[in-house]
Amino acid sequence: AFGGILSTVKSTRSASEEELTEKASLALSEMLSFGTTTCEAKSGYGLTTDEELKQLRAIQKLQERHAVDVVATFMGAHALPSEYKGNRDAYIRLLCEEMIPAVAEQKIAKFCDVFCETGVFNAQESRKILETGRKYGLTPKIHADEIDPIGGSVLAGELGAVSAEHLIVCPPEGISSMAKGGTVACLLPATSFYLGAGFAPARSMVEAGVPVAMASDFNPGSCPCLNMQFVIGLGCLKYKLTPEEVLTAVTLNGAAAIGMADQIGSVEVGKLGDLVVWDAPDLDYICYRIGSNLVKKVIKRGRMVP
C-alpha cells in the first residue's frame, strides 16, 4: 500500500544534495506565486542516516537562499526501508540511537514526525520515536489516522504534539485527546481529493475546541498539488467550514502547526509582516473560485516580492 514512498526513496537516494535543493526551489517559487510565504518541509525519503541528513541539509540551503521561509522536520520514521523488511526493531533502533542524535547534533530540524499507521509504525513504536526526539530537543509531530484509527491522534494529545496530520478517520477519543493536549489538527484535503479518500471530521474538531489548520501535503506520491488556493476551496466544499474558519486554518492555525504563531499568521504589531493582497471583492470569492490564482501582490517580511 505504501510502495509510492519507497519508489520516491530510490529516486531521492540517487539525487545529489544540490539537485534536491534546485528542484525544491522551483516548487517554492510556485508556492510563492500562489501566496505561500512560509512552509514546512519534511525529510523521510532517504531512510538512512546519511540520506536523511542530506535532505535536511537541502532544506537548510532553501531557507538560506529562498524568499519563502522553510521550517525543517525530520521524518526518518516515514516508512520501513526495504533493507529492513522483517527487522523493524533494528530500524527503530537506528532511528533512536543514530539518526535522531545526528539530526540534533547538526541542529538542522525543529520537529520530529512519525507515520503512525497500519503497516508503518504502531502507536507504541511512534511513542518511543517521538519521546526520543523530544529528549534530543525535537518537538513531536505525527501523521495519524489516515487509513486506520490505531491510536495516533490519541497519542498526539498525550504527548502534546504540536500537530497531527491527515486525521481522515480520527475517532472521537482522538479529537478529545488533541483538544486536551493543545495539538493542532493539520488537515490535508488535497490529498484526500487526489487519492479519492474520505475527508477528516473538521466540524467535529472545531466544535471540540481543536485548532484546525490546513496544508497542501505537496509530495510526489499522494498529492502533486501545491496551490493553497485549491486547498482553501476544498476546505469550504468538503469540510463545510466557513470562509472565516478556512482563512484561520491556512494562516494563524497553520503558523501554530509549525510553532510560529507568534511571528506569522496574522497582521499584528511585532510580527514579520507577511501578507497577501488578493484580486477579489471579498473572502467568499476566494473560496468560490476554487483553484484560480487570485493573488495580486505578495509581501514578505514587509517587502514586496518581485
Segments predicted by a language model, with ranges:
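Active-site-adjacent C-terminal substructures of enzyme catalytic domains
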Residues: 139, 149-266, 278-282, 290, ...
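Anion (oxyanion) recognition and catalysis
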Residues: 32, 64, 134, 179, ...
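Loop/turn positions that initiate beta-strands
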Residues: 270-273
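Flexible glycine-/small-residue-enriched beta->alpha junction loops
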Residues: 1-5
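Metal-coordinating catalytic core of metallo-dependent amide/deamination hydrolases
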Residues: 6-25, 29, 37-150
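Short aromatic-centered micro-motifs
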Residues: 298
